[in-house]
Amino acid sequence: MPTWLWGLLLTAGTLSAALSPGLPASADPCYDEAREPRSCIPGLVNAALGREVLASSTCGRSANRVCDSSDPQRAHSADLLTSAPGTASPLCWRSDLLQQAPFNVTLTVPLGKAFELVFVSLRFCSAPPTSVALLKSQDHGRSWVPLGFFSSSCTLDYGRLPAPADGPSGPGPEALCFPAPQAQPDGGGLLAFSVQDGSPQGLDLDNSPVLQDWVTATDIRIVLTRPAIQGDTRDGGVTVPYSYSATELQVGGRCKCNGHASRCLLDTHGHLVCDCQHGTEGPDCSRCKPFYCDRPWQRATGQEAHACLACSCNGHARRCRFNMELYRLSGRRSGGVCLNCRHNTAGRHCHYCREGFYRDPGRVLSDRRACRACDCHPVGAAGKTCNQTTGQCPCKDGVTGLTCNRCAPGFQQSRSPVAPCVKTPVPGPTEESSPVEPQDCESHCRPARGSYRISLKKFCRKDYAVQVAVGARGEARGSWTRFPVAVLAVFRSGEERARRGSSALWVPTLDAACGCPRLLPGRRYLLLGGGPGAAAGSTAGRGQGLSAARGSLVLPWRDAWTRRLRRLQRRERRGRCGTA
């Protein structure tokens, strides 16, 4: 940067006045007139103004005839380097008298938070030193890296060649060695360093992470290594006593807010932090707020604000998380996943109703009562869940209604919870047209009576053994009568492949008319079907389900049979049926 420009900036403390904290000129620089987010940065400030300076050597700590820290008129403390200018002849910090090497004196300025540096300047009240090192820290003083060196002998002092006129030759910024500060007519001197002087031309701060890292600092350290005295002092010989003297240490920079804030403020703990916008938070606006993670955090640029977006949860969640895989699959548009959806909603965006609820078409999706309970009838419905769009519950046979709360036309209510609605009976055939006369039943079949012992041999001779509950009266369909049943337990399954659940039991119409077997709605029965004696072609003329044709046995259920049948079932699985 040209010397005349530094002189303009540093005269009469104009920078400190221009860079004092305050509200931005625009009401909200982080948003345009349409309230769309845009990149914004804090104003240029003197980051060192009013900050404490830690000096390794200060004249007057031990009182002498020149300096006395207890006397305001003779005190030359390091705080004078960063105090606001207000006197015609500024007071200067002075180091102790230095008589022999090493002549190193360090001035350290903690900036309080990360800043993006523009320049560093230091005005000397006496002849400026001929060797100075400028360092920065990005971790509040835990580690240091050089920003630049200033020397009349770069190779001897720092092992570096003088800085080329066109900047560094490498692809990224580097600490170069510049000429030592020049003495001025008033007897002092000026150290002026532009941070951009150490970076190659053409790098764009918005789009260069390397340059962003280069200009970022939380602390600045100036190391004065060789005073301006005659002769070479590197050999450590005794010289004329000398002390460094300087004033107006300025660190021009902006609060590092990554393009998401236009100013910095003091928080409740007195720490300097960015006044973050665009859904960001943190001292440097370097992360998204907890609910603003629909896309990953990015630094704002002049082309794109990269504002953090709130997750789309339709007002039903307060927390969400970011999923990179979903973000990629969406074409880098949305990656938020809502957590702990409320108001009976579910889904990534809390956009549908959870199981047992359905969407109320009369309310918007963001309404707290957008999801209504299915309220399926405990007897008439086959389950507790309903269609999430229409609210229709799954009804049992013969049951209808949105909640399955009434019998369908042609059905009447029964006392069975298995089949709450049965087909309305139609008048049966007259005595003249009855296919089986009462007097013929005795010769046709005889209902099972008395006790019945189930042996392994009898069990193995049957195709299947199941426990069924009759849901309604039988319905004659030609030569077969159909009884709706529920299979409650399966002890043996043969070719019929009996399974638990709703089914049908087919009984020959002649047998059903004579009560062989006699099946009553709501009762449970043991069905031993098939086996030797079963009628040939017994499946002809009937539908899917179980059959109780000749050779089958239907007995009123006894709970005591459960253990016996399970034991026979285990013996069958061990292959005992082949020996029975």
From Swiss-Prot:
<feature type="disulfide bond">
    <location>
        <begin position="255"/>
        <end position="264"/>
    </location>
</feature>
<feature type="disulfide bond">
    <location>
        <begin position="341"/>
        <end position="350"/>
    </location>
</feature>
<dbReference type="InterPro" id="IPR002049">
    <property type="entry name" value="LE_dom"/>
</dbReference>
<keyword id="KW-0677">Repeat</keyword>
<dbReference type="InterPro" id="IPR001134">
    <property type="entry name" value="Netrin_domain"/>
</dbReference>
<dbReference type="InterPro" id="IPR056863">
    <property type="entry name" value="LMN_ATRN_NET-like_EGF"/>
</dbReference>
<dbReference type="GO" id="GO:0007409">
    <property type="term" value="P:axonogenesis"/>
</dbReference>
<comment type="function">
    <text>Netrins control guidance of CNS commissural axons and peripheral motor axons.</text>
</comment>
<feature type="domain" description="Laminin EGF-like 1">
    <location>
        <begin position="255"/>
        <end position="310"/>
    </location>
</feature>
<dbReference type="GO" id="GO:0005794">
    <property type="term" value="C:Golgi apparatus"/>
</dbReference>
<feature type="disulfide bond">
    <location>
        <begin position="395"/>
        <end position="404"/>
    </location>
</feature>
<feature type="disulfide bond">
    <location>
        <begin position="288"/>
        <end position="308"/>
    </location>
</feature>
<dbReference type="InterPro" id="IPR050440">
    <property type="entry name" value="Laminin/Netrin_ECM"/>
</dbReference>
<feature type="domain" description="Laminin EGF-like 3">
    <location>
        <begin position="374"/>
        <end position="423"/>
    </location>
</feature>
<feature type="disulfide bond">
    <location>
        <begin position="353"/>
        <end position="371"/>
    </location>
</feature>
<feature type="disulfide bond">
    <location>
        <begin position="311"/>
        <end position="320"/>
    </location>
</feature>
<feature type="disulfide bond">
    <location>
        <begin position="460"/>
        <end position="577"/>
    </location>
</feature>
<dbReference type="GO" id="GO:0005576">
    <property type="term" value="C:extracellular region"/>
</dbReference>
<dbReference type="Pfam" id="PF00053">
    <property type="entry name" value="EGF_laminin"/>
</dbReference>
<feature type="signal peptide">
    <location>
        <begin position="1"/>
        <end position="17"/>
    </location>
</feature>
<feature type="domain" description="Laminin EGF-like 2">
    <location>
        <begin position="311"/>
        <end position="373"/>
    </location>
</feature>
<feature type="disulfide bond">
    <location>
        <begin position="257"/>
        <end position="274"/>
    </location>
</feature>
<feature type="glycosylation site" description="N-linked (GlcNAc...) asparagine">
    <location>
        <position position="104"/>
    </location>
</feature>
<keyword id="KW-0272">Extracellular matrix</keyword>
<feature type="disulfide bond">
    <location>
        <begin position="376"/>
        <end position="393"/>
    </location>
</feature>
<dbReference type="InterPro" id="IPR018933">
    <property type="entry name" value="Netrin_module_non-TIMP"/>
</dbReference>
<dbReference type="Pfam" id="PF01759">
    <property type="entry name" value="NTR"/>
</dbReference>
<keyword id="KW-0732">Signal</keyword>
<dbReference type="Pfam" id="PF24973">
    <property type="entry name" value="EGF_LMN_ATRN"/>
</dbReference>
<keyword id="KW-0325">Glycoprotein</keyword>
<feature type="glycosylation site" description="N-linked (GlcNAc...) asparagine">
    <location>
        <position position="387"/>
    </location>
</feature>
<protein>
    <recommendedName>
        <fullName>Netrin-3</fullName>
    </recommendedName>
</protein>
<dbReference type="InterPro" id="IPR008993">
    <property type="entry name" value="TIMP-like_OB-fold"/>
</dbReference>
<feature type="disulfide bond">
    <location>
        <begin position="441"/>
        <end position="514"/>
    </location>
</feature>
<dbReference type="InterPro" id="IPR008211">
    <property type="entry name" value="Laminin_N"/>
</dbReference>
<feature type="disulfide bond">
    <location>
        <begin position="313"/>
        <end position="338"/>
    </location>
</feature>
<feature type="disulfide bond">
    <location>
        <begin position="374"/>
        <end position="386"/>
    </location>
</feature>
<feature type="domain" description="Laminin N-terminal">
    <location>
        <begin position="36"/>
        <end position="254"/>
    </location>
</feature>
<feature type="disulfide bond">
    <location>
        <begin position="276"/>
        <end position="285"/>
    </location>
</feature>
<dbReference type="Pfam" id="PF00055">
    <property type="entry name" value="Laminin_N"/>
</dbReference>
<dbReference type="GO" id="GO:0007520">
    <property type="term" value="P:myoblast fusion"/>
</dbReference>
<feature type="disulfide bond">
    <location>
        <begin position="407"/>
        <end position="421"/>
    </location>
</feature>
